[in-house]
């Protein structure tokens, strides 16, 4: 781990530390553009040497209707808390809303790198590694959602 820490983004460390020194509640940052994605990856060191420490899923989108069930993705939320040891043991909280598809592997809590991008339908895709295909992506943890927000909590 010491080697990975020496490679981390020093500017990201300073920015994060400054925000905690100033105190107060840190608001969630929305991902709305590729610049927002770049900012997220820079400030969180691409979650390098991260460990998923908590997963919360809230589904208020299933309703019973005559003959079955109705699902509303707009009423779903997934919150991941990831301890990132490459940036002074910070906890990054990522909140996804309006989930279309997601999978968090219970035997893959380690994160070496992440990919975040907008797909052809302008949905946010978050993956726990850098995959080259949808089939490879489904071997790990991933989220496809309409929105993504993040903050550093600890």
State the predicted function of each range.
Residues 18-154:
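Surface-exposed, interaction-prone regions used to assemble/regulate multi-protein complexes
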Residues 14-16:
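N-terminal compositionally biased or targeting/leader segments
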Residues 4, 10-12, 21:
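Short hydrophobic alpha-helical segments enriched in small aliphatic residues
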């Amino acid at each position: 781990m010491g080697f990975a820490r020496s490679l981390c983004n020093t500017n990201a460390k300073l920015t994060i530390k400054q925000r905690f020194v100033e105190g107060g509640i840190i608001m969630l940052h929305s991902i709305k553009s590729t610049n927002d994605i770049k900012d997220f990856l820079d400030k969180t060191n691409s979650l390098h040497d991260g460990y998923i420490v908590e997963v919360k899923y809230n589904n208020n989108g299933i309703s019973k209707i005559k003959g079955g069930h109705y699902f509303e993705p707009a009423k779903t939320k997934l919150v991941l808390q990831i301890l990132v040891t490459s940036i002074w043991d910070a906890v990054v909280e990522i909140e996804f809303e309006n989930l279309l598809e997601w999978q968090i592997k219970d035997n893959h809590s380690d994160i070496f790198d992440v990919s975040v991008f907008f797909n052809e339908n302008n949905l946010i895709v978050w993956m726990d590694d850098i995959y080259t295909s949808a089939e490879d992506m489904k071997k790990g943890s991933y989220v496809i959602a309409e929105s993504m927000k993040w903050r550093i909590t600890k």
